């Protein structure tokens, strides 16, 4: 499995590759840092300019600084099936969601950078086709340097998220040469089409395919909800938890109360793992 070593071609390797290639995507990726009694989960800074040019040098320096920081705990992420990600809602039970969320701290700088790029993708408020292409190119290079199951999982997931942004925002409309995108997250395509539909049909279809009550209520203000959780639970945990992210197409799930509860619990109490796929 994911030993971090290069795998030789063969039946076992092919079967494992097929398993990794299932429609499972790493989502809600944030950096987690702890200092004294403060725990912070935050998006990775925007290491790109208005044209979408990726600042690889500063991004790499940021990742290396995290690797040697005693305050850095890892990247929090959750693995979601394509059918579970409904844009504004999650079609998954809380106990399953909790089991899927991990605090990931790889020993490889390239895997660290792939996580950082995933966080940047999800938090991009106004993504451009130039940025999507640059990020995919960088991910391709990083994956080629690792060539293990974790890098494959992160690469496939990031490519799916980039493809989702490109398709949802029509970023490649009129392009002479289409990029190497896949279909993206399927329910985001439905969400996009329903925005154009008559209101009666839209409401019915959204209730059938894009709404789930499994994860409970949404928070009016994620920041205020986290503050309330701190008041209730600080006496037990000894930590104050803070969340920072950009409100974007791919970060709507941070408005879910159960997501915030699980995120806080995992960031404060989870042991880190060095492999996503053991």
From Swiss-Prot:
Main location, first listed in the record: virion
Keywords linked to the UniProt accession: Host cytoplasm, Host Golgi apparatus, Virion, Virion tegument
A Pfam match: Herpes_UL7
GO cellular component: a single term: viral tegument
UniProt key word Hydrolase: no
Domain of life per record: Viruses
Places the protein is found: Virion; Virion tegument; Host cytoplasm; Host Golgi apparatus
Family: Belongs to the herpesviridae cytoplasmic envelopment protein 1 family.
Physiological role: Plays a critical role in cytoplasmic virus egress. Participates in the final step of tegumentation and envelope acquisition within the host cytoplasm.
The protein's assembly and partners: Interacts with BSRF1 tegument protein; the BBRF2-BSRF1 complexes oligomerize and might play a role in tethering the viral nucleocapsids to the host Golgi membrane during secondary envelopment.
Protein's UniProt name: Cytoplasmic envelopment protein 1
Lineage, uppermost ranks: Viruses, Duplodnaviria, Heunggongvirae, Peploviricota, Herviviricetes
